[in-house]
Amino acid sequence: MCRTLIDGPVRSAIAKVRQIDTTSSTPAAARRVTSPPARETRAAVLLLVLSVGARLAWTYLAPNGANFVDLHVYVSGAASLDHPGTLYGYVYADQTPDFPLPFTYPPFAAVVFYPLHLVPFGLIALLWQVVTMAALYGAVRISQRLMGGTAETGHFAAMLWTAIAIWIEPLRSTFDYGQINVLLMLAALWAVYTPRWWLSGLLVGVASGVKLTPAITAVYLVGVRRLHAAAFSVVVFLATVGVSLLVVGDEARYYFTDLLGDAGRVGPIATSFNQSWRGAISRILGHDAGFGPLVLAAIASTAVLAILAWRALDRSDRLGKLLVVELFGLLLSPISWTHHWVWLVPLMIWLIDGPARERPGARILGWGWLVLTIVGVPWLLSFAQPSIWQIGRPWYLAWAGLVYVVATLATLGWIAASERYVRIRPRRMAN
């Protein structure tokens, strides 16, 4: 009897311990999620290594594999701080005779990049590519975490996505030019992922100080009521302006009073590489549309569509809501070069592997974007334009240049409509 009295509680305790056993040979995460076999994981590692190696081989062995023109502008433009008053007079024309590239970034970017001019450029270029690839993998991993993944799972898919994404057009041009947009995307994703308001604000504010386009992320912070983070991002951005005024006062004032908003200085508005509303409508009209009635109407219509898409998404879908904001920002900006469209990587992940993947049309959109970007339609269209400066072109080329714009509208429209489908369909089934 005594044994029975003891055995009962003991057995009950053992049963409970087994339920919460963390030393089991099968971790809880593994029991919840089926991990890929070791062979598949090794294959993903091999594919990633081959992809990285092929990209580096292309850079250094192929004719015109990469010219790093934007990285030259970052580094050499920042070096002009040694000669006061020359920052926004600097141009890089060694490999761009058709368009000598000026330093077009906020003055804080020059402060950030200034130390790099002390390092041999060849070493900077190599490290820049490696850091960009690491940032791409980091962006994929954070995208997975925003969709509910854990630190222990998702590495297999992340390696596959990174290996493939290296070769889509936004990333190809990023590597070719030595662009910074992947790092800025990583900062924005991290700002959304972290619960620390001050870190979110710091990341968005600093990123906006280096390049203005990440400022659109503050709209997301306001939309999800992270008001402290949004306000702090403004404070940090203003602090970057203050630092710029202290270091290069006259140049900073010149940028924010004269150069800010001068899209023509950034580059040719109507080249096929500019996949914004302003670029698309300018190609159709045959002249720079500016922010005229047609462009403003297109932006306003897109804003309405983006709001509908935002409202259709579940509150917990942080990545989906962020993507709605970033896609709207790409169409809003006067210039959205193809290397600005690195946001298509988390978009494809969200469509193919995310919470909406089972909805009709999700994977069609995801794979459709992948085909568009692997082919690189704007890049192909660039061969049909006589020069990057010529705005007028045959009507069929002008309309073909809407490719990213139309695909974005289709994506936003699908997000808004698919939620309606989910809400209505169960009622129809019940009838």
Swiss-Prot record:
Coiled coil: none annotated. GO terms for biological process: glycolipid biosynthetic process; phosphatidylinositol metabolic process; phospholipid biosynthetic process. Keywords: Cell membrane, Lipid biosynthesis, Lipid metabolism, Membrane, Phospholipid biosynthesis, Phospholipid metabolism, Transferase, Transmembrane, Transmembrane helix. GO terms for molecular function: GDP-Man:Man3GlcNAc2-PP-Dol alpha-1,2-mannosyltransferase activity; phosphatidylinositol alpha-mannosyltransferase activity. Pfam families: GT87. It is a multi-pass membrane protein. Belongs to the glycosyltransferase 87 family. This is Polyprenol-phosphate-mannose-dependent alpha-(1-2)-phosphatidylinositol pentamannoside mannosyltransferase. It comes from Mycobacterium tuberculosis (strain ATCC 25618 / H37Rv).
